[in-house]
UniProtKB/Swiss-Prot annotation:
Acetylation as UniProt keyword: no
Functional note: Peroxisomal trifunctional enzyme possessing 2-enoyl-CoA hydratase, 3-hydroxyacyl-CoA dehydrogenase, and delta 3, delta 2-enoyl-CoA isomerase activities. Catalyzes two of the four reactions of the long straight chain fatty acids peroxisomal beta-oxidation pathway. Can also use branched-chain fatty acids such as 2-methyl-2E-butenoyl-CoA as a substrate, which is hydrated into (2S,3S)-3-hydroxy-2-methylbutanoyl-CoA. Optimal isomerase for 2,5 double bonds into 3,5 form isomerization in a range of enoyl-CoA species.
Name of the protein this chain belongs to: Peroxisomal bifunctional enzyme
GO biological-process terms attached to the record: fatty acid beta-oxidation
Molecular function as annotated in GO: 3-hydroxyacyl-CoA dehydrogenase activity; delta(3)-delta(2)-enoyl-CoA isomerase activity; enoyl-CoA hydratase activity; intramolecular oxidoreductase activity, transposing C=C bonds; long-chain-3-hydroxyacyl-CoA dehydrogenase activity; NAD+ binding
Protein family membership: In the N-terminal section; belongs to the enoyl-CoA hydratase/isomerase family.
Ranges where the record places region 3-hydroxyacyl-CoA dehydrogenase: 281-567
EC number of the protein: 4.2.1.17, 5.3.3.8, 1.1.1.35
GO cellular component, one term: peroxisome
């Protein structure tokens, strides 16, 4: 796990060997300890260089070991011993020096970085803090303000920025290890006291209290309710104390964080994202037995908000794109907006815009040679079928045909083509060039090659891609329905939009359900409800106003839309805004009047509703639908659902996702509360506990990592 060599006659070269990122596993720590002891005790050795195998210095702790007892030497005393050694130690940093890897570099007396290396302390993103002296040494090296920013955000920095900040001593484009070896020889005999960061006094600028107060306010605003960033501020503050006191405080804060549910949720989220990449189809096809095609050219049909974002996402990763619109004016508007988006994106990233990859057309005939087509017109099945028929006629037989539908039947689109096996859904989230999530929808006839290609393309575009089954709404939007429904029922019963939103935002959502709806546009859901026969001229005349299709229905959202209140775009929605397009939501007395009139009309006596009830009804209904989705094989594993909600719907990452949250609350508790609310509202099917939830509780409420076994067992008995 660490190779030892004597080079240049007097330099001990220690190479970490734990692929892929040379993580500091127990075996690696043990090897570092033994090789450092050997180097420091060998009179022939005058200096030490530490590097990593395969162009990577060290990616930090092996977080797979977090769940078990500590094995191998603890990191803090190991690093302290390296720093205290009497021979100069040089870190040769290539690839990454992150987390514990950067803390290892900090105890080296000198740091040489390759110009492509990236450095940082990202522990805060896992719900913890740098606990091997990182919060104590970095402020001593670069000062409190810069250290606070890096540690509380977990941001990685380039080698050039690291040099500017003082995190490294030299940046090289040459062989980093060779440069470090020469540097080490020149350092022999030089005093090391000023290079031992723990021995230095942290520079304290004027107004130190104000700096920490501002940092506290900033992390509270940006990471509402999240423990780790606040603990990082407190740990950096402890760097103003003697090292022995500061490192003790760092350890105390780490112990508190490590045992918290938030750390468990954030670490689960980290692994869930990787688990979702390992997709499996009901047919048995999966990520490791399906070869994707290489996509060099693509087409996007429709240059609305979504289509423009998809074009940008494709072009900025080097794919030639033909963008198609039905009218010249729409095409020209779309062209100008796409070019502007690409130019701004290129300027931000410091690269040239990929405008030469773009072609704009009014004719589907131009798509005859592309590798893949993504249809992104509005949600009209008849229109989409018409387009897919034409694509089937125009495109070469091997072209993949994908739809960006947010919930329509992908198999119905496959029906009208000559290649149903090459039809799949690629559900982007708006704005598509910003949002990370991509639902790849597998129809019953979608081939493993088609799904593998869509998943691979998503990854190439920087998306977090999740393979899901075909049903109305797929995973994300299907689950959203009971969540939204419960929010409107709570309005009926006495809550206000701002009360519900505040409860959800205090839970950790960036936006509550009604602010989110105003942003998305209330007319979108209204159109879907009309098409579903829930409102408008197609409603069954026998249905009472508050019942549809044999179940409870809340017409309040329809009443809001009937007044022309479509959200931010019209300056009025669930909230009022100073002008159309404004984002500053204010409570609207007209909405309160509408609610009071509605309750009076239907004889509803408003009652006091607690934040706990809001959270339970909205989130337990959300998770309950997730259990149904797992039972129906629309999602293959709970991690898929959680990743979709973390990256597509703003579920707070420190809560892990709706399924992980249910497991942390306790499945018995979730079942008991759903039964309670379903008893109170028996005509709301979404509150009836899922058979899978009941089965898991009957089997002792296993941890979420074990659900897959029980789901397979349940499927085998169906």
């Amino acid at each position: 796990m660490a190779r030892y060599e004597l080079v240049k006659r007097s330099v001990a070269l220690i190479t970490l060997t734990n692929p892929p990122v040379n993580a500091l596993s127990s075996a690696v720590r043990h090897a570092i300890s033994k090789t450092m002891e050997r180097a420091l005790s060998d009179p022939k050795v005058t200096a030490v260089v530490i590097c990593g195998e395969n162009g990577r210095f060290c990616g930090g702790a092996d977080i797979r070991e977090f769940a078990g007892p500590l094995r191998g030497p603890p990191l803090v005393p190991l690093l302290d011993a390296i720093e205290a050694g009497e021979k100069p130690v040089v870190a040769a940093i290539e690839g990454v020096a992150l987390g514990g890897g950067f803390e290892l570099a900090l105890v080296c007396h000198y740091r040489i970085a390759h110009y492509k290396a990236r450095l940082g302390l990202p522990e805060v993103t896992l719900g913890i803090l740098p606990a091997a002296g990182g919060t104590q040494r970095l402020p001593r090296l670069i000062g409190i303000p810069a250290a606070l920013e890096l540690i509380t955000t977990g941001r990685h920095v380039s080698a050039q920025e690291a040099l500017k900040l003082g995190m490294v001593d030299q940046v090289t484009e040459q062989n980093t290890c060779e440069v470090a070896l020469e540097f080490a020889l020149k350092a022999v005999g030089k005093p090391l006291s000023s290079r031992r960061l723990s021995m230095l006094t942290t520079p304290c600028p004027p107004g130190l209290d104000g700096i920490f107060e501002a940092a506290t306010m900033q992390v509270q605003k940006k990471a509402r309710g999240v423990m780790a960033p606040l603990a990082c501020v407190q740990a950096v503050r402890a760097a103003t104390l003697p090292y022995s006191e500061g490192i003790k405080r760092e350890g105390e804060l780490m112990a508190t964080l490590f045992s918290s549910g938030q750390a468990q949720a954030l670490q689960y989220s980290f692994f869930a994202q990787r688990t979702a990449e390992k997709w499996t189809l009901p047919s048995g096809a999966q990520w490791n037995n399906s070869k994707p095609r290489e996509i060099q050219s693509a087409a996007v049909i429709g240059l609305g908000t979504m289509g423009r974002g998809i074009v940008v996402s494709l072009a900025r990763v080097g794919i030639s794109v033909i963008a198609v619109e039905s009218e010249k004016k729409l095409l020209e508007t779309g062209r100008q907006m796409v070019i502007g988006m690409l130019e701004r994106d290129a300027k931000r990233r410091g690269v040239s815009a990929s405008l030469n990859l773009l072609k704009f057309s009014l004719s589907l005939q131009d798509l005859k040679d592309v590798d893949l087509v993504i249809e992104a017109v509005f949600e009209d099945m008849a229109l989409k079928k018409q387009i897919f028929r034409e694509l089937s006629r125009v495109c070469r037989p091997a072209t993949l045909l994908c739809s960006n539908t947010s919930g329509l039947d992908v198999d119905a689109l496959a029906d009208v083509t000559d290649r149903p096996q090459l039809v799949a859904g690629m559900h982007f989230f708006s704005p598509a060039h910003v949002m990370k999530l991509l639902e790849v929808v597998c129809g019953p006839r979608s081939s493993k090659e088609a799904i593998a290609t869509a998943m691979s393309l998503g990854k190439r575009m920087g998306k977090v891609s999740v393979a899901v089954g075909n049903c109305p709404g797929f995973v994300g939007n299907r689950m959203l329905m009971p969540y939204l429904e419960q929010a409107t029922f709570l309005l009926e019963e006495g809550a206000t939009p701002q009360q519900i939103d505040k409860a959800l935002e205090d839970f950790g959502f960036a936006m509550g359900v009604f602010r989110m709806s105003d942003l998305a546009g209330l007319d979108v859901g209204w159109r879907v409800r009309k098409e579903s026969g829930l409102t408008g001229p197609d409603v069954d005349p026998k249905d009472p106003p508050r019942r549809r299709q044999g179940r409870k229905y809340c017409p309040i959202p329809d009443m809001v839309c009937q007044q022309g209140r479509f959200g931010q775009k019209t300056g009025r929605g669930w909230y009022m805004y100073d002008k159309p397009g404004d984002t500053n939501a204010k409570p609207d007395p007209l909405i309160q009047n509408l609610l009071e009139t509605y309750r009076s009309r239907y004889g509803i006596q408003p009652r006091k509703i607690t934040d706990q009830e809001i959270i339970e009804r909205c989130l337990f209904a959300l998770a309950n639908e997730g259990f149904r989705i797992l039972k129906d094989k629309i999602a293959g594993q709970p991690e898929d659902i959680d990743v979709i909600y973390l990256f597509g719907y703003g579920f707070p990452r420190h809560r892990g996702g709706p399924m992980f949250y249910a497991s942390m609350v306790g499945l018995e508790r979730v079942l008991e509360r759903l039964e309670y609310y379903h008893h109170a509202l028996p005509d709301v099917p979404h509150l009836e506990p899922s058979p899978l939830l009941k089965k898991l509780v009957a089997r002792g409420s296993p941890p979420i990592q074990k659900w897959r076994e029980h789901i397979k067992s349940m499927h085998s008995h169906l």
